[in-house]
Amino acid sequence: MASFRRFRLLSPLKPCVTFGRMLYTRIDKDGLTMLAGHLAYVSLLSLVPLITVIFALFAAFPMFAEISIKLKAFIFANFMPATGDIIQNYLEQFVANSNRMTVVGTCGLIVTALLLIYSVDSVLNIIWRSKIQRSLVFSFAVYWMVLTLGPILVGASMVISSYLLSLHWLAHARVDSMIDEILRVFPLLISWVSFWLLYSVVPTVRVPARDALIGALVAALLFELGKKGFAMYITLFPSYQLIYGVLAVIPILFLWVYWSWCIVLLGAEITVTLGEYRAERHHAKSVTTQSPEM
């Protein structure tokens, strides 16, 4: 009787255990931590070129001049750990120095920025185990569209948001408190939508929208929790500042970028495993229904 009761308690957990086992096997086989380390290295190499290209695009449109300042502050306040101010100062110095580069150097910056997008594309298709290859021209067109249209669309959305916030009817107390609540979850929503687009568009195979939404939601929640946990760790355990002094920002930035990519790739693994788990259950049911006829 006791064993039967325990079986009834464990039976709802069995799908979760099976899914967790499949997810762990996939993560181990794909070498998630090594892939995250590769992307972290490429990200640090491409960080300054990518930011330079993005804010050069904003500079080309006068309407985005004020928005670019707000966007920069928003990114470092919501997507970087506690040392975001220091990192922002260093990156602004690097970007200012890059303005004196020649045409050849500028082309090199663009190529290096595209390298990050190419690396993300390659790693995600490794996780999806896709053998389909895009043509070089098509791939370059997609990378260039992401590099150029992405920042412009973000800037346009912030222009619209600023316009809506300036309207007089939004000054009402109840509406104002509602806007505060929306702005509080805005970074989470941006992360969710960004991860969903990443998992849906980048792989060269068809990805079910529901799986991509679930994987993106888990990644977005982990990203928000990881950001707060990392900031707490840096504040409460300042070992890097004690050891490295002024240079502490370098290992802290690398750790944060590496941790971020671990979360992004974990969301991708969850998205893939959801499809595999569903296929496994469908196969098990078909075998069960056919066995009596045998």
Swiss-Prot record:
InterPro entries: UPF0761_bac, Virul_fac_BrkB
Membrane-topology descriptor: Multi-pass membrane protein
First-listed, main subcellular location of the protein, grouped into a coarse class: membrane
Transmembrane segments: 44-64, 67-87, 108-128, 136-156, 185-205, 212-232, 246-266
Subcellular locations according to the entry: Cell inner membrane
Any Pfam family: Virul_fac_BrkB
GO-annotated cellular components: plasma membrane
HAMAP family (alphabetical): UPF0761 (MF_00672)
Annotated family: Belongs to the UPF0761 family.
Protein name: UPF0761 membrane protein YPO0028/y3801/YP_0029
